[in-house]
Every structure is written in C-alpha cells, then in structure tokens.
Swiss-Prot record:
Pfam families: Gemini_AL3 (PF01407). The lineage of its organism: Viruses, Monodnaviria, Shotokuvirae, Cressdnaviricota, Repensiviricetes. It comes from Beet curly top virus (strain California/Logan). Keywords: Host-virus interaction. GO terms for biological process: rolling circle single-stranded viral DNA replication. This is Replication enhancer.
Length: 136
C-alpha cells in the first residue's frame, strides 16, 4: 500500500492530517488541474495530469504544498487531452460536492471513483503525491 509522506521530512501523514477537511462550498475553485503531456499510440493514448490544491484550500487544511500527479492510459477516441481533463475535473467536483467535505483522502477517493468506476475506458493509472505540511 502506498503511504502518503511529507516530502520534506519523509514522515508519513497522520490520519488526522489526511482527513482534516473543510466544506466544499467554502473554498471557491479548490482544485487546479494541468495537462502536462498527451501522446497517442494508435487507438491507445497516455496523458499526464497534475492536480494542485489552491491557496485557500491549502491554508484551510494547514498544507504547505499538495500535488497529485496521474499518468493515465486509456482507449477513448473522443475523450482525450483537454476534453478529458475538463470532464475529469467536473466529475471530481460533483463527487466532492455530494460528499460536502474536501480533504486529501476524499480527493484521492474521488479520483479512484471517477477513473475506475465512471470511466470504463481507462486501463491504468499511476499516481504520485507530493505533500508538505506546514511546519510552523
């Protein structure tokens, strides 16, 4: 099992830190998604997405930095590149809005739900996190 660690100290994030949450409606535009690269190999494509927590969300959750990088392999002809990013963001926001709370664990659960249960064309996902808690 992949344990989320503080990249500066190397210590695992505690349960309290990972589940420390704030109401979804209280933070406008809490997640920033960026398409790093996209490549197509015939019917198969691969893309890398970076998800960043915005400043207001990081301040509310006492985070210095929180990035999640996803390398996704799939086989949809229509939903690729920027369109895939837009649909992923919308579905993730709907999932988090239904929960009502946003935290590190809920974002990861939401990504797993959207990528593995709603998108049936995604074949594999490699996920890396870069999290740093406020030390002061």
């Amino acid at each position: 099992m992949n344990v989320i660690e503080d990249f500066r100290t190397g210590e695992p994030i505690t349960l309290h830190q990972a589940t420390n949450s704030v109401e979804f409606e209280s933070v406008p535009n809490p997640l920033y998604m960026k398409l790093l690269w996209f490549e197509r190999y015939g019917p198969i494509y691969q893309l890398k997405i970076q998800i960043r927590f915005n400043y207001n969300l990081r301040r509310a959750l006492n985070l210095h930095k929180c990035w999640i990088e996803l390398t996704i392999t799939g086989s949809n002809r229509i939903l690729t590149g920027p369109r895939f990013l837009k649909v992923l963001k919308k579905r993730l926001e709907i999932y988090l809005d239904n929960l009502g709370l946003i935290c590190i664990n809920n974002v990861i659960r939401g990504l797993n739900h959207v990528l593995y249960e709603e998108f049936n064309f995604v074949s594999s996902v490699i996920q890396n996190q870069s999290v740093a808690m406020n030390l002061y």
